């Protein structure tokens, strides 16, 4: 809190100094006038610039022979043959314009990425789908199973289903629930595609998913702790009072 108070004091002094400088800034203008560098009236010896920004023979800022700022032969600022500023062959509307940009299409990769970053999965009672992970390298104690795992690891899940960590009393309960729901969902989804799992597959999936669920628990616990720390910090009365005072100075 001492370091926080020092930083808040520095922020207060910087804000107060900036407000003082804003009040002392001179008004914009030209040299020794306080106004425009090329005034439209009152210039000694006449004004070399037209008062309304037009060229030769332009009463209202348009091109040659333009009464109101349009192109050649344009009465009101449109393109050639346009009476009121529209596109080619248009009377001022914005429909059917040439080279009109099309609306960007939503990429399926973006949709999949959003669903894989902890989104709630519908139909699973509040379970969320974690982000994709690299399958861990696990040794099962014999050469056959180690080789079998290396050859079939791509068939096993690389994402886990889980509930928020604040709904569990400890890590073991979180991991147990995470393993069960993940294997169940992966088995059902894969079986409907015509692929079956042997007992060896299930055994290996349990080991793989368990490691992934432990990793997911550590990530979620860290994020939950950081959110809680931020809430405690900004809910303390001194910090709230100081922030309110700074907002009052800036807005006022």
Swiss-Prot record:
Primary location recorded for the protein, binned into one broad class: membrane
Intrachain disulfide bonds: 178-213
Gene3D superfamilies noted in UniProt: Prion/Doppel protein, beta-ribbon domain (1.10.790.10)
UniProt GO BP: protein homooligomerization
Keywords: Amyloid, Cell membrane, Copper, Disulfide bond, Glycoprotein, Golgi apparatus, GPI-anchor, Lipoprotein, Membrane, Metal-binding, Prion, Repeat, Signal, Zinc
Membrane topology: Lipid-anchor; GPI-anchor
UniProt-annotated stretches for the region Interaction with ADGRG6: 23-38
Keyword Nucleotidyltransferase: no
Residues holding Cu(2+) 1: 60-62
Propeptide section residues: 230-252
Family, per entry: Belongs to the prion family.
Domain comment (free text): The normal, monomeric form has a mainly alpha-helical structure. The disease-associated, protease-resistant form forms amyloid fibrils containing a cross-beta spine, formed by a steric zipper of superposed beta-strands. Disease mutations may favor intermolecular contacts via short beta strands, and may thereby trigger oligomerization.
UniProt-recorded name of the protein: Major prion protein
């Amino acid at each position: 809190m001492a370091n926080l108070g020092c930083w808040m004091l520095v922020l207060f002094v910087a804000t107060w100094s900036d407000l003082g400088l804003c009040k002392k800034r001179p008004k914009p203008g030209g040299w020794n006038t306080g106004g425009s560098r090329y005034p439209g009236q009152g210039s000694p010896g006449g004004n070399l610039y037209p008062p309304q920004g037009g060229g030769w023979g332009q009463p209202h800022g348009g091109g040659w022979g333009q009464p109101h700022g349009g192109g050649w032969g344009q009465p009101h600022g449109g393109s050639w043959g346009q009476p009121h500023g529209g596109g080619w062959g248009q009377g001022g509307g914005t429909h059917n314009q040439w080279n009109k940009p099309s609306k960007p299409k939503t990429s399926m990769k973006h949709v999949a990425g959003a669903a894989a970053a902890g989104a709630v999965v519908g139909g699973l009672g509040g379970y969320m789908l974690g982000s994709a992970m690299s399958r861990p390298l696990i040794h099962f104690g014999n050469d056959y199973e180690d080789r079998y795992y290396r050859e079939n690891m791509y068939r096993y899940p690389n994402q886990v289903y889980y509930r928020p960590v604040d709904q569990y009393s400890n890590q073991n309960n979180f991991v147990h629930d995470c393993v069960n729901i993940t294997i169940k969902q992966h088995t059902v989804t894969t079986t409907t595609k015509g692929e079956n799992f042997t007992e060896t597959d299930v055994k290996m999936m349990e080991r793989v998913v368990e490691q992934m669920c432990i990793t997911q628990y550590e990530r979620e616990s860290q994020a939950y702790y950081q959110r809680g720390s931020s809430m405690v910090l900004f809910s303390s009365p001194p910090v709230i009072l100081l922030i309110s005072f700074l907002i009052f100075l800036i807005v006022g």
